């Protein structure tokens, strides 16, 4: 099973969610660790395919989101966990999209530094 690597403040932010939200999103991350996809996980638009996923949960009128990538062989990288505050529909706010892009780059850098060269395992 792949480990979860938390980028930036995503772990602290995730742990601030209500327990029922943590449970549901935690299960989605567990499925990603085992190579499966939660039924509520959807590719995040703007990232070119199914490598960056978003899971959304509502709790007592508030909306919570976790964004993670399954692009890398060695880990599931949780890129961002946040409570959506914007009332402008379902679209992810631009400042959150920018943070996700920065953290995806950090995950890519981490992957490059820690990947096992092919044929050396």
For each predicted feature, which ranges?
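Basic, Lys/Arg-enriched alpha-helical interface segments
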Residues: 1-63, 72-75, 85-121
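Conserved catalytic cores of phosphodiester-cleaving nucleases, focusing on short active-site segments
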Residues: 66, 77-81
């Amino acid at each position: 099973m792949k480990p979860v690597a938390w980028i930036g403040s995503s772990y602290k932010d995730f742990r601030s969610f209500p327990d029922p939200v943590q449970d549901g999103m935690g299960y989605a991350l567990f499925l990603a660790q085992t190579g499966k996809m939660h039924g509520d996980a959807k590719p995040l638009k703007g990232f070119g395919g199914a490598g960056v996923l978003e899971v959304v949960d509502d709790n007592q009128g508030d909306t919570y989101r976790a964004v993670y990538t399954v692009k890398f062989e060695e880990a599931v990288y949780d890129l961002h966990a946040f409570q959506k505050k914007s009332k402008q529909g379902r679209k992810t706010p631009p400042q959150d999209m920018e943070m996700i892009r920065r953290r995806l780059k950090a995950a890519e850098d981490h992957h490059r530094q820690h990947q096992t060269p092919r044929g050396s395992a």
